[in-house]
């Protein structure tokens, strides 16, 4: 018996221009997924331009994914690359939800990315967030809760795409991701 997962990027990350615009538009698909026990893997980031980039995970979880989880309580969901305390809290509040955590969200904070200058190597989506969020992610990652697990989200880009005026989001961590995890 084969199983598969559906990834819903919602036009929020690199190369996801064809993603959907609102989770609730896909209720008929989620109903079938729940019935057939197909998990939903989701990049949880709002695409609303009025939402600050550092608040997009929380906005998406509150406005979109919470409604899906409420309507489909048996649908298994994975929030990919959680970046905030809000993401951790969301997973803990929903027994059918798990979450992946990346090496870069565990080891860096937004000051590393933007201060004293912008570092394209640390630009990813969801963006690296506050130091308090990072500490919460680390505490959760080493806490033993099986709802949380490693998701490397390694995303290499050609040099011209990563360091240009329109730097592509994504961190290539395949070469060192496990070492970062071991250090934590």
Predicted features along the sequence, with ranges:
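Divalent metal-dependent hydrolysis catalytic cores, especially in the metallo-beta-lactamase
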Residues: 1-15, 37-49, 76
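Active-site-adjacent C-terminal substructures of enzyme catalytic domains
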Residues: 17-40, 64-184
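Glycine-rich phosphate-binding "P-loop"
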Residues: 44-58, 167
